[in-house]
Amino acid sequence: MSLFSPHRILLRTGSAFQLATATRALLSTSSQLRNTKNAQSGLAEQARAEEPVASSPSQTTRPEQKSLEEETTKQTQTHADSTVNEWGARLTDLNINARLPRSVQALYLRPLRRKAEYGLPVCDLQLRSYSVRNLEFFADFAIRAAYYLNLPVSGPVPLPKIVERWTFPRSSFVHKKSQENFERITVRRLIQIKDGNSQAVQAWLAFLRKHAFYGVGMKANIWEHESIEIAKTMDQTLPEIEKALEPHISQFGRREDAEPAHDLITNFLGSERLSLSKGPLTDVRGG
Protein backbone atom coordinates (compact mmCIF):
# COMPACT_ATOMS: atom_id res chain seq x y z
CA MET A 1 0.00 0.00 0.00
CA SER A 2 1.37 3.32 -0.94
CA LEU A 3 1.28 6.16 1.55
CA PHE A 4 -0.38 8.59 -0.84
CA SER A 5 -3.75 7.86 -2.33
CA PRO A 6 -4.51 8.92 -5.91
CA HIS A 7 -7.24 11.23 -4.68
CA ARG A 8 -4.82 13.11 -2.43
CA ILE A 9 -2.30 13.39 -5.26
CA LEU A 10 -4.91 14.93 -7.50
CA LEU A 11 -5.84 17.48 -4.84
CA ARG A 12 -2.22 18.42 -4.32
CA THR A 13 -1.55 18.74 -8.04
CA GLY A 14 -4.70 20.85 -8.38
CA SER A 15 -3.55 23.26 -5.68
CA ALA A 16 -0.11 23.46 -7.30
CA PHE A 17 -1.74 24.26 -10.62
CA GLN A 18 -3.81 27.02 -8.98
CA LEU A 19 -0.66 28.52 -7.45
CA ALA A 20 1.07 28.44 -10.80
CA THR A 21 -1.80 30.29 -12.51
CA ALA A 22 -1.86 32.95 -9.77
CA THR A 23 1.89 33.57 -10.08
CA ARG A 24 1.57 33.83 -13.86
CA ALA A 25 -1.22 36.42 -13.48
CA LEU A 26 0.89 38.45 -11.05
CA LEU A 27 3.86 38.32 -13.37
CA SER A 28 1.74 39.52 -16.30
CA THR A 29 0.32 42.49 -14.31
CA SER A 30 3.79 43.49 -13.05
CA SER A 31 5.11 43.38 -16.61
CA GLN A 32 2.22 45.57 -17.79
CA LEU A 33 2.91 48.12 -15.04
CA ARG A 34 6.57 48.20 -16.00
CA ASN A 35 5.64 48.79 -19.63
CA THR A 36 3.30 51.69 -18.73
CA LYS A 37 5.97 53.25 -16.50
CA ASN A 38 8.50 52.98 -19.28
CA ALA A 39 6.05 54.57 -21.73
CA GLN A 40 5.35 57.47 -19.35
CA SER A 41 9.05 58.07 -18.75
CA GLY A 42 9.63 58.03 -22.51
CA LEU A 43 6.91 60.61 -23.07
CA ALA A 44 8.33 62.84 -20.33
CA GLU A 45 11.80 62.65 -21.88
CA GLN A 46 10.37 63.55 -25.28
CA ALA A 47 8.57 66.55 -23.78
CA ARG A 48 11.77 67.68 -22.08
CA ALA A 49 13.66 67.29 -25.30
CA GLU A 50 11.03 69.31 -27.15
CA GLU A 51 10.93 72.16 -24.57
CA PRO A 52 13.95 74.12 -25.83
CA VAL A 53 12.66 73.79 -29.36
CA ALA A 54 9.26 75.27 -28.34
CA SER A 55 10.82 78.00 -26.18
CA SER A 56 13.10 79.31 -28.86
CA PRO A 57 10.33 81.17 -30.78
CA SER A 58 8.93 82.64 -27.50
CA GLN A 59 12.36 84.07 -26.70
CA THR A 60 12.44 85.70 -30.07
CA THR A 61 8.91 87.20 -29.59
CA ARG A 62 9.52 88.68 -26.08
CA PRO A 63 11.16 91.90 -27.31
CA GLU A 64 8.29 92.41 -29.73
CA GLN A 65 5.73 92.01 -26.92
CA LYS A 66 7.63 94.50 -24.76
CA SER A 67 7.66 97.03 -27.55
CA LEU A 68 3.91 96.58 -28.10
CA GLU A 69 3.20 97.04 -24.37
CA GLU A 70 5.33 100.19 -24.26
CA GLU A 71 3.49 101.60 -27.26
CA THR A 72 0.07 100.91 -25.69
CA THR A 73 1.11 102.53 -22.38
CA LYS A 74 2.41 105.57 -24.25
CA GLN A 75 -0.85 105.85 -26.15
CA THR A 76 -2.94 105.67 -22.95
CA GLN A 77 -0.72 108.27 -21.25
CA THR A 78 -0.98 110.63 -24.21
CA HIS A 79 -4.78 110.17 -24.29
CA ALA A 80 -5.07 110.91 -20.55
CA ASP A 81 -2.81 113.96 -20.88
CA SER A 82 -4.87 115.24 -23.78
CA THR A 83 -8.13 114.88 -21.81
CA VAL A 84 -6.62 116.65 -18.80
CA ASN A 85 -5.38 119.46 -21.00
CA GLU A 86 -8.79 119.78 -22.63
CA TRP A 87 -10.58 120.07 -19.29
CA GLY A 88 -7.95 122.50 -18.02
CA ALA A 89 -8.43 124.67 -21.09
CA ARG A 90 -12.20 124.56 -20.59
CA LEU A 91 -11.95 125.60 -16.94
CA THR A 92 -9.58 128.46 -17.69
CA ASP A 93 -11.90 129.59 -20.47
CA LEU A 94 -14.85 129.53 -18.06
CA ASN A 95 -12.94 131.46 -15.41
CA ILE A 96 -11.85 134.12 -17.89
CA ASN A 97 -14.87 134.54 -20.13
CA ALA A 98 -17.74 133.53 -17.79
CA ARG A 99 -18.58 133.99 -14.11
CA LEU A 100 -21.03 132.61 -11.60
CA PRO A 101 -24.00 134.71 -10.44
CA ARG A 102 -23.38 137.09 -7.58
CA SER A 103 -25.73 135.20 -5.31
CA VAL A 104 -23.73 132.00 -5.86
CA GLN A 105 -20.36 133.74 -5.46
CA ALA A 106 -21.52 135.28 -2.18
CA LEU A 107 -21.84 131.82 -0.60
CA TYR A 108 -18.06 131.37 -0.82
CA LEU A 109 -17.26 134.87 0.52
CA ARG A 110 -17.81 136.78 3.73
CA PRO A 111 -21.23 138.44 4.11
CA LEU A 112 -21.37 142.05 2.94
CA ARG A 113 -22.16 144.79 5.47
CA ARG A 114 -23.49 148.33 5.45
CA LYS A 115 -21.65 151.09 7.29
CA ALA A 116 -23.45 152.81 10.17
CA GLU A 117 -23.59 156.60 9.98
CA TYR A 118 -24.53 157.51 13.57
CA GLY A 119 -24.15 154.19 15.40
CA LEU A 120 -27.49 154.33 17.23
CA PRO A 121 -28.71 150.84 18.23
CA VAL A 122 -32.15 149.97 16.93
CA CYS A 123 -32.48 146.21 17.49
CA ASP A 124 -30.62 143.56 19.48
CA LEU A 125 -31.27 140.05 18.21
CA GLN A 126 -30.14 137.22 20.46
CA LEU A 127 -29.85 133.74 18.97
CA ARG A 128 -29.79 130.67 21.20
CA SER A 129 -29.18 127.04 20.38
CA TYR A 130 -27.71 123.82 21.73
CA SER A 131 -25.73 123.28 18.50
CA VAL A 132 -22.92 125.64 17.49
CA ARG A 133 -23.16 124.59 13.85
CA ASN A 134 -26.84 125.53 13.50
CA LEU A 135 -26.25 128.78 15.38
CA GLU A 136 -23.37 129.92 13.16
CA PHE A 137 -25.29 129.03 10.01
CA PHE A 138 -28.39 131.02 10.98
CA ALA A 139 -26.33 133.99 12.20
CA ASP A 140 -24.63 134.17 8.79
CA PHE A 141 -28.04 133.99 7.10
CA ALA A 142 -29.38 136.85 9.26
CA ILE A 143 -26.40 139.09 8.44
CA ARG A 144 -26.80 138.48 4.70
CA ALA A 145 -30.52 139.27 4.89
CA ALA A 146 -29.81 142.54 6.74
CA TYR A 147 -27.41 143.65 3.98
CA TYR A 148 -30.10 143.36 1.29
CA LEU A 149 -32.51 145.39 3.49
CA ASN A 150 -29.91 148.18 3.81
CA LEU A 151 -29.48 147.64 7.57
CA PRO A 152 -26.05 148.19 9.18
CA VAL A 153 -25.15 145.14 11.29
CA SER A 154 -22.52 144.43 13.93
CA GLY A 155 -21.80 140.93 15.12
CA PRO A 156 -22.34 138.10 15.67
CA VAL A 157 -20.84 138.55 19.14
CA PRO A 158 -20.45 135.36 21.23
CA LEU A 159 -22.18 135.62 24.60
CA PRO A 160 -21.40 133.55 27.72
CA LYS A 161 -22.71 130.01 27.69
CA ILE A 162 -25.60 128.95 29.89
CA VAL A 163 -24.71 125.68 31.64
CA GLU A 164 -27.49 123.79 33.42
CA ARG A 165 -27.07 120.56 35.38
CA TRP A 166 -29.56 118.18 36.98
CA THR A 167 -29.11 115.14 39.21
CA PHE A 168 -31.71 112.39 39.38
CA PRO A 169 -31.87 108.86 40.81
CA ARG A 170 -31.00 106.34 38.16
CA SER A 171 -34.07 104.22 38.83
CA SER A 172 -36.12 102.75 41.64
CA PHE A 173 -35.57 99.65 43.76
CA VAL A 174 -32.08 98.27 43.07
CA HIS A 175 -30.54 101.40 41.48
CA LYS A 176 -32.27 103.82 43.83
CA LYS A 177 -29.08 104.98 45.57
CA SER A 178 -27.11 105.49 42.34
CA GLN A 179 -27.58 108.91 40.73
CA GLU A 180 -27.35 110.16 37.16
CA ASN A 181 -26.20 113.65 36.10
CA PHE A 182 -27.49 115.58 33.10
CA GLU A 183 -25.94 118.69 31.57
CA ARG A 184 -27.30 121.13 29.00
CA ILE A 185 -25.18 123.89 27.43
CA THR A 186 -26.88 126.77 25.61
CA VAL A 187 -24.75 128.72 23.14
CA ARG A 188 -25.68 132.33 22.32
CA ARG A 189 -24.85 134.97 19.69
CA LEU A 190 -25.79 138.66 19.60
CA ILE A 191 -26.52 140.61 16.39
CA GLN A 192 -27.08 144.36 16.66
CA ILE A 193 -28.63 146.63 14.02
CA LYS A 194 -27.78 150.33 14.01
CA ASP A 195 -29.33 153.34 12.26
CA GLY A 196 -32.11 151.28 10.73
CA ASN A 197 -35.65 152.17 9.85
CA SER A 198 -38.24 150.62 12.13
CA GLN A 199 -40.24 149.23 9.20
CA ALA A 200 -37.11 147.68 7.71
CA VAL A 201 -36.29 146.12 11.07
CA GLN A 202 -39.80 144.66 11.33
CA ALA A 203 -39.49 143.26 7.80
CA TRP A 204 -36.09 141.75 8.69
CA LEU A 205 -37.46 140.05 11.81
CA ALA A 206 -40.51 138.76 9.91
CA PHE A 207 -38.23 137.32 7.22
CA LEU A 208 -36.14 135.54 9.87
CA ARG A 209 -39.27 134.13 11.55
CA LYS A 210 -40.54 132.89 8.20
CA HIS A 211 -37.28 131.14 7.32
CA ALA A 212 -36.34 130.06 10.86
CA PHE A 213 -33.75 127.29 11.19
CA TYR A 214 -34.47 124.25 13.34
CA GLY A 215 -32.97 124.21 16.81
CA VAL A 216 -32.35 128.00 16.92
CA GLY A 217 -34.36 130.35 19.15
CA MET A 218 -34.62 134.14 18.77
CA LYS A 219 -35.23 137.02 21.17
CA ALA A 220 -35.30 140.62 19.93
CA ASN A 221 -35.21 143.95 21.78
CA ILE A 222 -36.37 146.87 19.60
CA TRP A 223 -35.89 150.60 20.21
CA GLU A 224 -37.94 153.20 18.38
CA HIS A 225 -37.08 156.90 18.38
CA GLU A 226 -40.06 159.26 18.59
CA SER A 227 -40.46 163.02 18.57
CA ILE A 228 -41.31 165.20 21.57
CA GLU A 229 -45.00 165.29 20.62
CA ILE A 230 -45.42 161.58 21.26
CA ALA A 231 -48.74 162.07 23.11
CA LYS A 232 -50.40 163.54 20.02
CA THR A 233 -49.16 160.72 17.84
CA MET A 234 -50.47 158.14 20.32
CA ASP A 235 -53.89 159.82 20.33
CA GLN A 236 -53.94 159.80 16.55
CA THR A 237 -53.07 156.10 16.35
CA LEU A 238 -55.58 155.09 19.06
CA PRO A 239 -58.58 154.56 16.69
CA GLU A 240 -56.51 152.32 14.45
CA ILE A 241 -55.42 150.25 17.46
CA GLU A 242 -59.02 149.94 18.67
CA LYS A 243 -60.14 148.68 15.27
CA ALA A 244 -57.36 146.11 15.27
CA LEU A 245 -58.22 144.91 18.79
CA GLU A 246 -62.02 144.96 18.39
CA PRO A 247 -62.42 141.32 17.18
CA HIS A 248 -60.31 140.12 20.12
CA ILE A 249 -61.96 142.30 22.80
CA SER A 250 -65.46 141.41 21.64
CA GLN A 251 -64.96 137.91 23.04
CA PHE A 252 -64.70 139.30 26.61
CA GLY A 253 -67.59 140.77 28.67
CA ARG A 254 -70.50 139.88 30.98
CA ARG A 255 -74.02 138.72 30.28
CA GLU A 256 -76.84 141.25 30.02
CA ASP A 257 -79.20 139.28 32.26
CA ALA A 258 -76.62 138.98 35.02
CA GLU A 259 -76.94 140.79 38.36
CA PRO A 260 -75.13 144.08 38.88
CA ALA A 261 -71.61 143.83 40.18
CA HIS A 262 -72.38 145.98 43.26
CA ASP A 263 -75.09 143.62 44.45
CA LEU A 264 -72.87 140.59 43.97
CA ILE A 265 -70.12 142.10 46.08
CA THR A 266 -72.43 143.12 48.91
CA ASN A 267 -74.07 139.71 49.00
CA PHE A 268 -70.71 138.00 49.11
CA LEU A 269 -69.38 140.16 51.93
CA GLY A 270 -72.60 139.81 53.93
CA SER A 271 -72.74 136.05 53.70
CA GLU A 272 -72.18 133.75 56.68
CA ARG A 273 -68.83 132.64 55.35
CA LEU A 274 -67.25 135.97 56.24
CA SER A 275 -69.02 136.50 59.56
CA LEU A 276 -66.57 136.76 62.42
CA SER A 277 -68.94 135.53 65.12
CA LYS A 278 -68.82 131.95 63.89
CA GLY A 279 -65.03 131.75 63.87
CA PRO A 280 -62.92 130.26 66.69
CA LEU A 281 -61.31 132.55 69.29
CA THR A 282 -63.42 135.52 68.22
CA ASP A 283 -65.00 136.20 71.64
CA VAL A 284 -63.16 138.61 73.88
CA ARG A 285 -62.64 137.45 77.43
CA GLY A 286 -63.94 139.63 80.13
CA GLY A 287 -61.38 140.87 82.61
Curated annotation (Swiss-Prot):
Which GO terms fall under biological process for this protein? Answer: translation
Q: Taking the first listed entry, what is the main subcellular location of this protein, grouped into a coarse class?
A: mitochondrion
Q: Per the database entry, which stretches of residues form a coiled coil? A: none
Residue ranges of the region described as Disordered: 33-84
Q: Which residues form the organelle targeting sequence per the record? A: 1-33
* Highest taxon of source: Eukaryota
Compositional bias ranges of the Polar residues kind: 33-43, 74-84
Q: In which compartments does the protein localize?
A: Mitochondrion
- Keyword annotations: Mitochondrion, Ribonucleoprotein, Ribosomal protein, Transit peptide
SMART domains documented for this protein: Ribosomal_S10
Q: Please list the residue ranges that the record marks as compositionally biased, kind Basic and acidic residues.
A: 63-73
This entry's Gene Ontology molecular function terms read: structural constituent of ribosome
Purpose of the protein: Involved in mitochondrial genome encoded proteins translation. Involved in the binding of tRNA to the ribosomes.
Q: Which family does it belong to?
A: Belongs to the universal ribosomal protein uS10 family.
Q: Which HAMAP family match?
A: Ribosomal_uS10
Q: What is this protein called?
A: Small ribosomal subunit protein uS10m
From which organism does this entry originate?
Answer: Emericella nidulans (strain FGSC A4 / ATCC 38163 / CBS 112.46 / NRRL 194 / M139) (Aspergillus nidulans)
| Gene encoding the protein | rsm10
